Amino acid sequence: FCLSRGLGDVYKRQEIRHLGHSVQKSYEQIEKLMDEIIRQQNERRKSELDALQSQINPHFLYNTLDSIVWMIEGERYEDAVFMITQLASLFRISLSRGKTIISVEDEIKHAKNYMNIQKIRYKNSFAIDFSIEEEILHCCTVKLVVQPLLENAIYYGVECMDGDGEIDVNGYRREDDIYIEVRDNGLGIPEDEVEQLLKENNRVHKRGSGVGLLNVHNRIRLRFGEEYGLEIESEPDEGTTVRIHLPYIVYTPEEQERLESGRKPVSYTHLTL
């Protein structure tokens, strides 16, 4: 009886060990599967971001190069050198070694390069002012989000205002969020069109940015979550304000790498990535 009882205990222990090994193996398989799903999601997200970001309108480049040629032909060499310098800086930031996350400071530099070029092309027919709080300059942003808004402000807003056009760019922090606003005093956008601008079935014809407001909106949401993106306010004959809403995340190489890979940044736990 004692022998059979002892054997029974041995069998039970073996069954428990076997069950434990099976559970551990199943757990490892589930963990590998979850890692693979996350990897595929991150790759798909990066592919979507790259595809959206690559939709930049080449006409801006062609027009700028044409302007440089005209300046050289007109012996306006200093203006031509300035345009080339601005264009080189603009594309250096645009490329960013393949990164999709850059600092707000670099994003604003890119926007200023763009507006310096446009002011020459448009013969200073509008005024531009940048007012950015210093504490947000070293925060993270998806790159190429301000320039399309500026292009939109030119085409939708101040292009036909005969020297009275004004564009203001303001950046500020509110608690755990940062905002970058592009405001113009132009023609404004009808209410029914404003409602369509950020919808996937957007029927509004955009002469301006080849990237488009919807593209910028989607890229921000893909990277930071659906609570972020663009907000648009417009009044016909009064002007338009487009507001970029981002989380406050200090830019460091570590945080940049985490965001690029689709992981939550250490300094901000509210994101739902």
Task: Mark where each language-model region is.
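C-terminal end segment of the histidine kinase catalytic
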Residues: 232-271
